[in-house]
Amino acid sequence: EMCIRDRPRFGLGADILMGFPGETEAHVLETLEVVRSLPLTYAHVFPYSARPGTVAAELPDQVGKAVRQERAARVRAGVEAKREAFWKDTLTCERLLVALDCNEDAGSASGQHGVDECYVPCRLRTPLRGEGHTLIPVRPVSVSRKGVIVEPVRP
């Protein structure tokens, strides 16, 4: 809550393990509620898999593989919805700083790309020459499946 209060545009990442032995549907619903309540913009959600010789592999109430995968998919969908909303909210920002991580040719189909200060993937609508590996002030213009499309802001 303090982070959100101090930085209203705040994104959070997490690793989420689903299907650990003993996990119930109530646990899944609780996890989904946590996902809804946090400003998650990224999560690595993965199903538990038993590793021979570990304590967890010997625990009772092992969750079946199909159930583990289904639960992980539900949580991924919840995180995806949060991420999409966060990316769309980025369009309300007047200005972002993007750290460019490549300097491709201006004619490249993928253009220059990087991340903003909240690690939102961004792609320059019109690539700039000689602007690789640097911070660029930009204005968000639209959202794509892969992130936010931006254009440079000149002082």
Describe each model-derived feature in a short phrase.
Residues 2-4:
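Short, small-residue-biased leader/transition segments that mark boundaries at the very start
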Residues 12-18, 44-45:
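Hydrophobic faces of well-ordered beta-strands that scaffold small-molecule active sites
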Residues 17-19, 48, 101-103:
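Short loop/turn motifs enriched for small/polar and acidic residues
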Residues 20-37:
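Catalytic cores of alpha/beta
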Residues 39-49:
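Non-cysteine beta-strand/loop elements that form the S-adenosyl-L-methionine
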Residues 48-56:
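Short, charge-patterned binding micro-sites
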Residues 58-155:
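Terminal RNA-binding accessory module
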